[in-house]
Amino acid sequence: MAKSGKKYIQALSKVNKLKSYNIDDAISLLKEIKFVKFDETIDVSVNLNLKKNHTVRETLVLPHQFMKEKRILVFAKGEKAEEAREFGAAYVGDDDLINKIKDGFSDFDVVVATPDMMKDVGKLGPILGKRGLMPNPKTQTITNDLKGTIASLKKGRTEFRANKNGVINFSVGKSSMDSKKIRENYDEFIKELLKRRPSDLKGTFVDSVYVSSTMGPSVKIDFV
């Protein structure tokens, strides 16, 4: 939805575009200029200085959860399938589940697979890849440790990644949350992001950081 209209312009007028705010002041400002009734998401947008060969991607569990519990789909057989069911996966199967997805089933948020299933799961590449849900070792979603993986996903483990333009968009809270909790989620995200600086990168890694709410204007962060 385009950000426009009288209320948006009024909110925008309260943001000093020539100023970089510290994160605490920025969060307070976003709460102050909120003009919609629903509980907005607080988002962080980071512009990175990356080369074409650089990949920045990581998973983390934020200290304060705010999103609804993810619907976990697991590809597994035998004892591993039973393990996935026992620890709370929403959907568990092998060939039957693969065929169901081919037929259009999409009522899930994250996909996990045991290594032995990947040969068959790979056939779903065009479908799962389009949604960014293809199991991947980098996101710890190809694993035999279904108990640990499902537990961490239920706790809110989520992923961030830089797009082709070197931008990461990541949510750190809801406008209704305590400001301190939003700040702590932001700090955890930034801490994990800085660990992913490419080893061969010269110069600045983070060019700029902005925070915004779903419908509100962005606020530049004084990032050092």
Curated annotation (Swiss-Prot):
It holds the Pfam family Ribosomal_L1. The gene is rplA. Belongs to the universal ribosomal protein uL1 family. This is Large ribosomal subunit protein uL1. The keyword RNA-binding applies. HAMAP family: Ribosomal_uL1_B. It comes from Borrelia recurrentis (strain A1). Part of the 50S ribosomal subunit. Keywords: Repressor, Ribonucleoprotein, Ribosomal protein, RNA-binding, rRNA-binding, Translation regulation, tRNA-binding. Binds directly to 23S rRNA. The L1 stalk is quite mobile in the ribosome, and is involved in E site tRNA release.
